[in-house]
Structures are given as structure tokens and as C-alpha cells.
């Protein structure tokens, strides 16, 4: 996974496969650990001027099953678009690599399905959440 400004890619004759459209982060009361992605996703969608229905792929980290279910239910994720090739409960999520793994999965799935937008989101310890929206190029 390589991130860089568009002009830096052009200068090196690299062809980007996606662009970061927007991101969001948020925190909730730590008693509700795992639900932080909800306001983070809402922030990212607002910044991108998009709705959940505009997303073609959703890669939502599964810290554990009930946490993933709560986020998906609260945000009304389409199960057909969410973790289409399996999530962390099935595949694992090495600490420190989760964001990169989810981003790569989302971008490659966008290309495979010729979709436009992908959402990547995960909870972070202490009630925090983070989300990013990518567009296929």
C-alpha cells in the first residue's frame, strides 16, 4: 500500500488505482467500545457528500462479531456489500495492519466489481472510530 499526492504519482509515472475522498474519526463514551465507527462513518459521509446507498463496497472491521453487527445495524449496511470476501472474524486482523488490509481489500474489490466508492471503517480502543471513503480510478 503506497499513499502519495496525485502530482507525486504523475512525476514518477505511476498510475493510481484509487483516491481518498474523505475520512472521519470520532469518539464515544468508552463504555460503548466498538460503536465509535458509527459517528466516524457519518463524519466521512458528510465530508464526501455521500450516503450509505452510494457505497459499492464496505469493509468494516470486526473486532468481534457483536461489535460488527452493532455498527452494521446502526448504519444500515447492506449485507451484500459488507465484507464481501470475509471479515476479520474469519480472516483475522493483525494489530497495526488492519487499516492497510481493509483498504487494500476494498480497493481491489472496487476494481473487481467496477464499483465507484468504498468505505473502510474500524473501531479503535477507548471508544474511538475511524472511517475513510475511497474512489476507484
Model-derived segments and their meaning:
Residues 1-2, 99-137:
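Conserved beta-strand-centric core segments of catalytic alpha/beta enzyme folds
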Residues 2, 20, 28, 41, ...:
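Conserved small-residue
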Residues 21-47, 60, 91-101, 105:
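Active-site pocket-shaping loop/turn-to-helix segments
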Residues 9-13, 42-56, 75-76:
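Phosphate/pyrophosphate-binding loops at sites that engage ATP/ADP/AMP, CoA/4′-phosphopantetheine
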Residues 1-17:
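Channel- or pocket-lining gating/hinge segments that regulate access to a cavity or pore
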Residues 74-101, 106, 110-116:
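Conserved catalytic cysteine-centered active-site region
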Amino acid at each position: 500500500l503506497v499513499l502519495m499526492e496525485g502530482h507525486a504519482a504523475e512525476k514518477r509515472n505511476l498510475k493510481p488505482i484509487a483516491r481518498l475522498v474523505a475520512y472521519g474519526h470520532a469518539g464515544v463514551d468508552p463504555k460503548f467500545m466498538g460503536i465509535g465507527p458509527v459517528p466516524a462513518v457519518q463524519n466521512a459521509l458528510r465530508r464526501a457528500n455521500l450516503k450509505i446507498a452510494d457505497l459499492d463496497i464496505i469493509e468494516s472491521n470486526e473486532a468481534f462479531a457483536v461489535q460488527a453487527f452493532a455498527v452494521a445495524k446502526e448504519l444500515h449496511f447492506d449485507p451484500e456489500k459488507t465484507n464481501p470476501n470475509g471479515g476479520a472474524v474469519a480472516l483475522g486482523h493483525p494489530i497495526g495492519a488492519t487499516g492497510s488490509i481493509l483498504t487494500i481489500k476494498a480497493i481491489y474489490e472496487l476494481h473487481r466489481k467496477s464499483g465507484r466508492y468504498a468505505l473502510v471503517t474500524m473501531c479503535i480502543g477507548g471508544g474511538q472510530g475511524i472511517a475513510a471513503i475511497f474512489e476507484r480510478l
